[in-house]
C-alpha cells in the first residue's frame, strides 16, 4: 500500500490564500516550450489543498501531494512547508 501512496503526483507551489478552515490555495507555476517557436512560456494553476493543522500561511512555499477527493475542489493534501514566508 505505501508504494502506491508514494507514486502520487507531488508539486511545489506558493500559498496564495489561507482564509478557509483547514484549506489552502496553492499557486503552481510551470514552464512549457512553444512547439514551433521554442520560446518558454510560464503557466500557472491554483490547487486547493487540505491543511489539517492550519500551519501554512500566505507566502509560504509548500509541497502538496495528490490524494483522494476530500471535497468538491480539494484533491491535494499538504506534505510539508519547504520555506516559510518572510514577514517584513
Swiss-Prot record:
SUPFAM superfamilies referenced in this protein's UniProt entry, alphabetically: Nucleic acid-binding proteins
Transmembrane intervals: none
GO biological-process terms attached to the record: translation
Keywords noted in UniProt: Ribonucleoprotein, Ribosomal protein, RNA-binding, rRNA-binding
InterPro entries associated with the record: NA-bd_OB-fold (IPR012340), Ribosomal_uS17 (IPR000266), Ribosomal_uS17_bact/chlr (IPR019984), Ribosomal_uS17_CS (IPR019979)
Superkingdom of the source species: Bacteria
Family matches, as PROSITE patterns: RIBOSOMAL_S17
Gene Ontology cellular-component terms listed: cytosolic small ribosomal subunit
Gene Ontology molecular-function annotations: rRNA binding; structural constituent of ribosome
Keyword flag Nucleotide-binding: no
Quaternary structure, from the entry: Part of the 30S ribosomal subunit.
Function: One of the primary rRNA binding proteins, it binds specifically to the 5'-end of 16S ribosomal RNA.
Family to which the UniProt record says this protein belongs: Belongs to the universal ribosomal protein uS17 family.
Protein name per its UniProtKB record: Small ribosomal subunit protein uS17
Organism listed in the record: Brevibacillus brevis (strain 47 / JCM 6285 / NBRC 100599)
Amino acid at each position: 500500500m505505501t508504494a502506491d501512496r508514494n507514486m502520487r503526483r507531488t508539486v511545489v507551489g506558493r500559498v496564495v490564500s489561507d482564509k478557509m478552515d483547514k484549506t489552502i490555495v496553492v499557486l503552481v507555476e510551470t514552464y512549457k516550450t512553444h512547439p514551433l517557436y521554442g520560446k518558454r512560456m510560464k503557466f500557472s494553476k491554483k490547487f486547493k489543498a487540505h491543511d489539517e493543522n492550519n500551519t501554512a500561511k500566505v507566502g509560504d512555499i509548500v509541497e502538496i501531494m495528490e490524494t483522494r477527493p476530500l471535497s468538491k475542489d480539494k484533491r491535494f493534501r499538504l506534505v510539508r512547508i519547504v520555506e516559510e514566508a518572510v514577514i517584513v
